[in-house]
Amino acid sequence: MTITTQTDARKLRARLKHPIIDADGHWAEFAPDMRAEFRRIGGDTAVEALDMASARIPNSLRMSVAERRRRRIGQEAFWFLPTKNTLDRATAMMPRLLYERLDDLGLDFCVIYPTAGLGYYRLPPEKHRRALCRAYNVFTAEQFRPYGDRIIPAAIIPMYSPEEAIEELEFASKQLGLRVVMMGSLIRRPIPALVEDHPEAAKFVEWYDPIAIDSEHDYEPVWQKLRELRIAPSFHNGARSILLRNSPSNFCYNHIGHFASASEAMAKAIFLGGVTRRYPELNFAFLEGGAGWACSLYADLIGHWEKRKLDALENTKPANLDRTGLLALAEKYAKPEVVDAIRRGEGLDDNGDGTGGVEDLDDYSRCKIASKKDFEDLYVKRFYFGCEADDPINAWAFNRKANPMGARLNAFFSSDIGHFDVPDMTEVVPEAYELVEHGLLDDDDFRDFMFTNAVRFWGEVNPDFFKGTVVEKQAAEVLAKPR
């Protein structure tokens, strides 16, 4: 097989004055090797856990459409890894080949996330979940350790409880030397009322815990541990085959928008839960969902604050209704039946005078918003958004005219190499550059998208993150400059 080295990606990279960091590539873990290594690392428990986690999608695909419809099980991805492009398939499987091809792909540095392991943090039995994540983290660290100057893998952090998260953070950071983490979130939990009143049904209906707001667990120690370890958390959660993305016959129906949906839930919880207010030392990344949802959420959070902050609630407070004035208007403009109802005080408090038992009426109280400027500090500066190369909506993040207060959101390049939506790994960097060629980004925007924002995401939290890498000097120059 001939390996082409004079790729368009290599040529484009040679013209640029800055490195390129891929903030979210994927490798395709080779199951037979992984199984053998898991047994060595974690024994029978790790292998049992691997078998449990690996069975879900194949079991679903073995069902007929009719059976999935009967059970309301979503259609999963079939044929999701490269096959026709054999070189890319091998590149996704073999870390050394990826390392050797980075220049051909136009990449200086790459952060690698799981494929099979993306959902390992969800495995329900605690014993197996923790063994599975531990074995995976050891396995991945060993696989990529020789290539650390250009490739860093992400550790999987289970989050069903703060205790298991802290233990794995400590191990991954201090024992394995990993400095990228993929945090579990949208944790499936039983509904207490069903457990108490209908225990036979409780296992079939769950709620999704975004951990940063209204959780039954206190995750404050997790944020504290991330700050202590100087680790910027990333979230690569999906919402496929649940709720409104649960077609039993159409994978694309389930797949489109599911990363954005999950990311929005997490970002909204972290913001409204006040995490960015309490931990300004941390940055947070939401991967593979693009930036369109992030721009929309940013504007919507501001819009809701303007209408629902405490002083704005005076506009809808039931006690502020001038009933005498309303009656006078009704007597002039309404039919007699309406006048009589208003005179009796009927129909004027659609929801009564209740507030649902909420003592603090300010939904933004945890993040202590005093002015619109706070949204820049707590949202714009703290959140980062992984965007694939072929998404033209990436340009929205950099559009100061479209975003409130002239904001540029922190979109960064996330290639998704190794998955079905990248048929040729050598094309992702040129594809990203099309935003410049089409006039949607300028050169400064492209530099920030492909390099600067990734440096700031990890480097602001851990200034030593890029030490020993091929981009150490350029990253240090970025971090030495004020925003």
Regions found by a protein language model. Give the residues of each.
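Mid-to-C-terminal alpha-helical segments outside catalytic/metal-binding sites
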Residues: 2-19, 29-109, 138-146, 167-171, ...
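Residue-level preference for long, well-ordered alpha-helices that form the structural scaffold
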Residues: 87, 91, 125-136, 161, ...
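Divalent metal-dependent hydrolysis catalytic cores, especially in the metallo-beta-lactamase
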Residues: 20, 81-90, 100-123, 150-156, ...
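Active-site loop-helix segments enriched in His/Asp/Glu that coordinate
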Residues: 104-106, 115-145, 149, 162-173, ...
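Residue-level marker for buried hydrophobic side chains located in beta-strands
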Residues: 19-21, 233, 411-413
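Short glycine-enriched loops at secondary-structure junctions
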Residues: 115-116, 237-242, 417-420
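Catalytic pocket-lining loop regions of alpha/beta-barrel enzymes
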Residues: 3, 131, 144-152, 157, ...
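Short glycine/proline-rich turn/loop motifs
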Residues: 73-87, 117-123, 203-204, 251-256
